[in-house]
Amino acid sequence: MTAEHVSRGDIFLVALNPTRGSEIRKTRPCVIVAPLTTGGHPYPFRVRCTFDGKDGHVVADQLRAVDRERLVKHLGRLSDTALNELLGVLQAMFAV
């Protein structure tokens, strides 16, 4: 899979630096919709998930548009259950 074939729910390693202020930093796995983290707290706009054997959260409160050049490597896909929960959180966030 190349960065040209990106689908909702795919997980890519994304180079997020440089950043400003409190933007999420580092090169980290990101769901194509929101970044993933194994740290942090379970805030209302974060969706618990397990990926690559690690428990973490989809950080839906840190949405960011990125250019395809920032996509380092395709890592896999978010589970259907976690993706559906994420889409529900996004609907609540944006009141759609």
Residue ranges, per PLM feature:
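Conserved functional hotspots at enzyme active or ligand-binding sites that engage polyanionic ligands
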Residues: 1-96
